[in-house]
UniProtKB/Swiss-Prot annotation:
Gene3D superfamilies: Periplasmic binding protein-like II, Winged helix-like DNA-binding domain superfamily/Winged helix DNA-binding domain
Pfam family, one: LysR_substrate
InterPro entries: CysB_PBP2 (IPR037423), LysR_subst-bd (IPR005119), Tscrpt_reg_HTH_LysR (IPR000847), WH-like_DNA-bd_sf (IPR036388), WH_DNA-bd_sf (IPR036390)
DNA-binding region range list: 19-38
Taxonomic path: Bacteria, Pseudomonadati, Pseudomonadota, Betaproteobacteria, Burkholderiales
Record-level GO BP terms: cysteine biosynthetic process
Function of the protein: Transcriptional regulator preferentially involved in the control of sulfate transport and reduction. Binds to DNA at target promoter regions.
Domain HTH lysR-type: from-to ranges: 1-59
Native source organism of the sequence: Burkholderia cenocepacia (strain ATCC BAA-245 / DSM 16553 / LMG 16656 / NCTC 13227 / J2315 / CF5610)
Top-level division of the source organism's lineage: Bacteria
Protein name according to UniProt: HTH-type transcriptional regulator CysB
Length: 313
């Protein structure tokens, strides 16, 4: 048995049991993948996959147990590689961050700027996606950490820690009647067409829930995945924007005004997610600490080992 066989098993599952796609992902041949998996099954004395003819269909019951072991072994192998790299070069390497647009655009820049001052030789990559997508990037080892508000705390494969709180705000043109309402109510907002986030982003469920509790059905004329799009269409007069307050910049958004509405929708928590049991290079801890001063290396290490008590802001 060898690591290549383990990788073939894992990739077959990731590719929805399509061995041709698994072979492409691992830059090898489909017959080679099929043969290696059969040899592993023969050595273990059990079938890992159910088959219909020559086609792999699903995991068998022992296959599920084997997959869990394979995942752990391959993660440990990656951790060993990182340990070696860490000690060979403490202040250089690669760091990939997966983040939603709002976090990449508004939360990360200050932390990244300070990080690059401290670690100029570390190559940074930022991948953007939905909360679900960035979580899966970490799970599948495509990113070292994920930053988002939703979804990332829902995966058992991840450890998520709170970074900071933020609230929703209404954004309107400088002469909008809502600026005269203090405080703004849900009934006030419901009088206007609304522009806000897609259902998968930035606390949209809280917005929907608040209106539903009030018995209101707001006219949401446009949904977007980032705040810049929301602000653009507010400027065009299409409606009132509801977005994260951290995405408003008075200097850049001079034609708009921000109205706090946190009292209507409650607070939201941006979280950083790391893979359960992962080995992190020292500079990853530094970046997490820059994102949230309330976090430190000891707390992060305890959380990764499952030793930390539930920690919230």
């Amino acid at each position: 048995m060898n690591l290549h066989q383990f990788r073939f098993v894992r990739e077959a599952v990731r590719q929805n049991f399509n061995l041709t796609e698994a072979a492409k992902a691992l830059y090898t041949s489909q017959p080679g993948v099929s043969k290696a998996i059969i040899e592993l099954e023969d050595e273990l004395g059990v079938e890992i996959f159910t088959r219909h003819g020559k086609r792999v269909r699903s995991l068998t019951e022992p296959g599920r147990i084997i997959l869990a072991s394979v995942e752990r072994i391959l993660q440990e192998v990656e951790s060993l590689k990182r340990v070696g790299k860490d000690y060979a070069a403490q202040d250089q390497g690669n760091l990939t961050i997966a983040a939603t647009h709002t976090q990449a655009r508004y939360s990360l820049p200050a932390a990244i700027a300070e990080f690059k001052k401290r670690f100029p030789k570390v190559h940074l990559s930022i991948l953007q996606g939905s909360p679900t997508q960035v979580a899966e990037m970490v799970i599948h080892d495509q990113a070292d950490l994920a930053i988002a508000t939703e979804a990332i705390s829902d995966y058992k494969e991840l450890v998520s820690l709170p970074c900071f709180q933020w609230h929703h705000a209404a954004v309107v043109p400088a002469d909008h009647p809502l600026l005269e309402r203090k405080p703004v109510t849900l009934d006030d907002l419901a009088q206007y067409p609304l522009i806000t986030y897609d259902d998968a982003f930035a606390g949209r469920k809280k917005i929907n829930h608040a209106f539903a509790l009030r018995g209101l059905s707001p006219d949401i004329v446009l949904e977007a995945i980032d705040a810049d799009v929301i602000k653009t269409y507010v400027e065009l007069g299409l409606g009132v924007g509801i977005m994260a307050d951290i995405a408003f910049n008075p200097e850049r958004d001079r034609g708009l005004r921000l109205i706090p509405v946190g009292h209507l929708f409650g607070s939201n928590v941006t979280r950083v997610a790391l893979k359960q049991g992962a080995y992190l290079r020292s500079y990853v801890y530094t970046l997490v600490e820059l994102l949230s001063p309330t976090l430190n290396r000891k707390l992060i290490e305890q959380a990764l080992k499952g030793e930390a008590e539930s920690y919230e802001l």
